[in-house]
């Protein structure tokens, strides 16, 4: 029987498969592939969990951002209302101050007018008295002066009693 190269190749192949089966390479290969598949499945589950957690955090931060924006808008609106109220109050106080100052100025002007009128009247009375005295001194005699003096003293006594 002649053994050619294909026979030895077949024998080598059979021996190779027997050796692989004896060393349990298919089981080790299957176990290795199963472990690799389990690792990939665990990594996918972890990635899914992390993705859900990230989405939850994103939703929470978006909610907090909206709340912060609403709060900021409320603060701005309150500040605008307060500024408007302060502006209105300052305007009202300024108008009241101007009105008081105007009234005080008008009162001072009126008082100055009254004082001036009083001074003019007093000066007119003084001038009239001086003119009367001069006229009376020039035109009355000593007897008429004594009679006028006595009448005036009597009038003063009657008004004092």
Curated annotation (Swiss-Prot):
Keyword Acetylation found: no
Transmembrane segments: 3-23
Intracellular or extracellular location(s): Cell inner membrane
Keywords assigned: ATP synthesis, Cell inner membrane, Cell membrane, CF(0), Hydrogen ion transport, Ion transport, Membrane, Transmembrane, Transmembrane helix, Transport
A Gene Ontology term for the protein's cellular component: proton-transporting ATP synthase complex
Short name of any one Pfam family annotated for the protein: ATP-synt_B
Disulfide pairings: none
InterPro entries: ATP_synth_b/b'su_bac/chlpt, ATP_synthase_B_chain
MF GO annotations: proton-transporting ATP synthase activity, rotational mechanism; proton-transporting ATPase activity, rotational mechanism
Membrane topology classification: Single-pass membrane protein
Origin: domain of life: Bacteria
The protein's assembly and partners: F-type ATPases have 2 components, F(1) - the catalytic core - and F(0) - the membrane proton channel. F(1) has five subunits: alpha(3), beta(3), gamma(1), delta(1), epsilon(1). F(0) has three main subunits: a(1), b(2) and c(10-14). The alpha and beta chains form an alternating ring which encloses part of the gamma chain. F(1) is attached to F(0) by a central stalk formed by the gamma and epsilon chains, while a peripheral stalk is formed by the delta and b chains.
Protein family per UniProt: Belongs to the ATPase B chain family.
PANTHER family reported for this sequence: ATP SYNTHASE SUBUNIT B (PTHR33445:SF1), ATP SYNTHASE SUBUNIT B', CHLOROPLASTIC (PTHR33445)
Role played: F(1)F(0) ATP synthase produces ATP from ADP in the presence of a proton or sodium gradient. F-type ATPases consist of two structural domains, F(1) containing the extramembraneous catalytic core and F(0) containing the membrane proton channel, linked together by a central stalk and a peripheral stalk. During catalysis, ATP synthesis in the catalytic domain of F(1) is coupled via a rotary mechanism of the central stalk subunits to proton translocation. Component of the F(0) channel, it forms part of the peripheral stalk, linking F(1) to F(0).
Protein name: ATP synthase subunit b 1
Organism: Agrobacterium fabrum (strain C58 / ATCC 33970)
Lineage of origin: Bacteria, Pseudomonadati, Pseudomonadota, Alphaproteobacteria, Hyphomicrobiales
